[in-house]
UniProtKB/Swiss-Prot annotation:
Species of provenance: Pasteurella multocida (strain Pm70)
Alphabetical list of Gene3D superfamilies matching this protein: 1.20.5.3310
Location within or outside the cell: Cell inner membrane
GO molecular function: protein transmembrane transporter activity
Name of the protein described by the UniProt record: Sec-independent protein translocase protein TatB
Length: 191
């Protein structure tokens, strides 16, 4: 479809890995593949509907030509075929209208599903952020470019990862005058 070679695809994956990181790259790939599948489905639906419309239009044109040739002058066999053409054209028209009605509802449902999915992912991401990160994100999103926003998000992820293993020290600093030197403790134990 896009005529992308293996080397170009590999380059895109490496850039995606660098920009998004190993945690978010699979999620991004799944999201993009979902969009591609949705777009392909919509394109095939449109293509099928166009084909049916063209067939219907051709049938209607042939019917009009037959009517112009004066329907009574035709032989009985030809009049039967014209009637059959009219009946098949009417069947195709009703089927096409039903499919169009069904497609409109399914398209609306698909759009709602995609919106709900994006809203739920954004809500889970904001729930995971601390209030200070939310304030920082809210103030910087308006000013930063998408690349800078991605970099900032990556830095925030790294900070969350670091804070998991190295929690902040909330204790007050201990001064050297309050701590006994270890050499005195060792000497006291020997004595």
């Amino acid at each position: 479809m896009f005529d992308i070679g293996f080397s170009e695809l590999f380059l895109i994956l490496v850039i995606g890995l660098l920009v998004l990181g190993p945690k978010r790259l699979p999620v991004a790939i799944r999201t993009v593949m979902g969009w591609v599948a949705t777009i392909r489905g919509l394109a095939s639906n449109v293509q099928n509907e166009l084909k049916q419309e063209l067939k219907l239009q051709e049938l209607q044109e042939s019917i009009k030509k037959a009517e112009e040739l004066n329907f009574q002058q035709l032989s009985p066999e030809l009049s039967k075929t014209v009637e059959e053409l009219k009946a098949s054209a009417e069947k195709m028209r009703t089927a096409l209208e039903q499919k169009a009605a069904a497609t409109n509802t399914t398209l609306e449902e698909q759009i709602k599903e995609i919106k709900n999915a994006t809203e739920s992912t954004s809500q889970t991401l904001t729930e995971q952020l601390t209030p200070s990160e939310q304030v920082t994100e809210a103030t910087t999103d308006d000013v930063l470019s998408p690349a800078e926003q991605a970099e900032l998000a990556e830095e925030n992820d790294e900070m969350v990862y670091i804070q998991q293993y190295y929690p902040d020290d909330d204790d007050e600093p201990v001064f050297a005058s309050k701590v006994k030197p270890q050499t005195e403790e060792i000497q006291d134990k020997k004595a």
